[in-house]
Amino acid sequence: MADQLVRATAAQGRIRAVGVLSTRLTEEARGRHKLSYVATAALGRTMAAGLLIASNFKQTEARVNLRLQGDGPLGGILVDAGADGTVRGYVKNPQVELPPSPKGKLDVGRAVGANGFLYVVKDLGYGYPFSGTTELVSGEIGDDVTHYLVTSEQVASALMLGVFVGADGVDAAGGLLLQVMPSADGQEDEELAATLERRLASVEGFTPLVRSGKRIPQILEELLGDMGLEIFPEVQLVRFHCHCSPQRVLGALKMMGEAELLDMIEKDGGAEATCHFCNQVYQVKASELETLVEQLRSEREVSSQE
């Protein structure tokens, strides 16, 4: 099944619901970064969370960055997700592997670490970003993002994330986000929020449902079918996509300055650059570096004549 995002409402618009299936894009991230089992689960959960948050943005070019910086051996996670359905991300130490948790599951919480912060930066397409920071709750990512949504954005939220990694790769990945919209007077419906939390808590997890063959509309129907569920007919496809390019690499190298470029030409006969987000390697020839040097000299000459 293609990776996709499904939106819905319930309780006469008081509940906003969105679900994302991100199995393929999580597997692509695993392959690109050569991730361990626990690193795959951690990055996969964070990418799903990013897509769920970005799904509420109005502008197509709007994006959100999630950075988890805990005290665990993964060393940090950074994800960039957009309202256009694209997402990318990486972990600092992708090869880290840990024994299973006491429950027999991948120990994402210990890999990330419970002591640290979640940094969120939103670019809503208006020319200036919005940022928020909250302390990590458990390092399990779902708890941490929920804590951010409730405390920083002040929206009652229930979030479920999951990644199942088998011997041959990612079998299932994605998540659900249920939110109670404030009333006209700004008051929260605490009873409704508690109901959503109980219903999500009663589910054994997102990936078991997906692996049993259920699709997102079916899962939403089970959770909210008795609450006036309305599923939007438009299904948005989501994918792993990075915005890096040879041109951007050259632009970054140019910013290093003439002296550094000349040193690369003399000592290395070129340059090699790797994109952190997608692990794409770019080889830059000496002739391309020489062109950058010429551009810098020309720009400096023009500037001196002004």
From Swiss-Prot:
Disulfide bonds join 242-244, 275-278. Pfam families: HSP33 (PF01430). It comes from the Bacteria. It is found in: Cytoplasm. One of its GO terms (cellular component) is cytoplasm. SUPFAM superfamilies: Hsp33 domain, HSP33 redox switch-like. NCBIfam families: PRK00114.1. Redox regulated molecular chaperone. Protects both thermally unfolding and oxidatively damaged proteins from irreversible aggregation. Plays an important role in the bacterial defense system toward oxidative stress. This is 33 kDa chaperonin. The lineage of its organism: Bacteria, Bacillati, Cyanobacteriota, Cyanophyceae, Gloeobacterales. The gene is hslO.
